[in-house]
From Swiss-Prot:
Species this protein is from: Erwinia tasmaniensis (strain DSM 17950 / CFBP 7177 / CIP 109463 / NCPPB 4357 / Et1/99)
Pfam family, one: Arg_repressor
Keyword Ubl conjugation attached: no
Gene3D superfamilies reported in the protein's UniProt record: 3.30.1360.40, Winged helix-like DNA-binding domain superfamily/Winged helix DNA-binding domain (1.10.10.10)
Location in or out of the cell: Cytoplasm
Protein name: Arginine repressor
Length: 156
């Protein structure tokens, strides 16, 4: 029970630190958590927590790249502001490629992955600002491209 309470305290402190939007590296987050009294925290634990809570690196008001948590922790929807992060949607013979604002690709890919094969998406690979999407077996790349354009209400 005590470990559960410690874990909850760690999560609470972690989220509070990320809301400050001033940490540009995992090492800085480790140091801040150690200063908060979590002596056993290390970089790999911070990395797992960043992934678990969907944290991304984005620019803060000072235009510095920092870690932050997404506004919503559920699966994003196309009615959320995420569609505003999509800058370009294009395709070739094999893949659909989406370019996003820096740090937004993984969130957009998560949305697309949640739609799945029924919507024509076999899978996605996301970097910082680029997503590769491969069509499911019964869809052409062009059909997938058109469906994604409709999804994000864009005429690109």
């Amino acid at each position: 029970m005590r470990n559960s309470s410690k874990q909850e305290d760690l999560i609470k402190a972690f989220k509070a630190l990320l809301k400050e939007e001033k940490f540009s590296s995992q090492g800085e987050i480790v140091n801040a958590l150690q200063e908060e009294g979590f002596e056993n925290i290390n970089q790999s634990k911070v990395s797992r927590m960043l992934t678990k809570f969907g944290a991304v690196r984005t620019r803060n008001a000072k235009m510095e790249m920092v870690y932050c948590l997404p506004a919503e922790l559920g699966v994003p929807t196309t009615t959320s502001p995420l569609k505003n992060l999509v800058l370009d949607i294009d395709f070739n013979d094999a893949l659909v490629v989406i370019h996003t604002s820096p740090g937004a690709a993984q969130l957009i890919a998560r949305l697309l992955d949640s739609l799945g094969k029924a919507e024509g998406i076999l899978g996605t690979i996301a970097g910082d600002d680029t997503i590769f999407i491969t069509p499911a077996r019964s869809f052409t790349v062009k059909q997938l491209h058109d469906a994604i354009l409709v999804l994000f209400e864009q005429e690109l």
